[in-house]
């Protein structure tokens, strides 16, 4: 089965996002339990398409792409802060816009 792919801009460069669990074939050193991977030198992001983790994994790997100097712990902290903030974001603003809500 072919993986779904999209192209997104990051830092004025085109990055390919591949929705499949990363494997050793994709990048040497991938661990079996990895659900995402950012390969900066190839401008590729791999994201396991599992519905329970796809959004957080996508966000996590994009943070790695945008801020390659950050440690894994810092990326996790950023990911959690952003997801928590969006969890509290008023749904009516998302659906109707600020002026209509």
Language-model regions, residue ranges each:
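Active-site recognition of the HExxH zinc-binding catalytic motif
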Residues: 56-68
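Metalloprotease/metallohydrolase-associated module, dominated by Zn2+-dependent proteases
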Residues: 1-53, 68-101
């Amino acid at each position: 089965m072919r993986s779904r792919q999209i192209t997104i801009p990051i830092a004025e460069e085109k990055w390919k996002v591949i929705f499949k669990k990363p494997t050793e074939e994709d990048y040497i050193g991938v661990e079996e339990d990895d659900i995402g991977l950012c390969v900066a030198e190839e401008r590729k992001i791999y994201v396991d398409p599992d519905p329970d983790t796809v959004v957080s994994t996508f966000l996590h790997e994009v943070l790695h792409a945008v801020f390659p100097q950050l440690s894994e712990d810092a990326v996790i902290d950023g990911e959690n802060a952003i997801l928590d903030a969006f969890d509290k974001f008023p749904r009516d603003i998302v659906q109707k816009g600020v002026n209509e809500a």
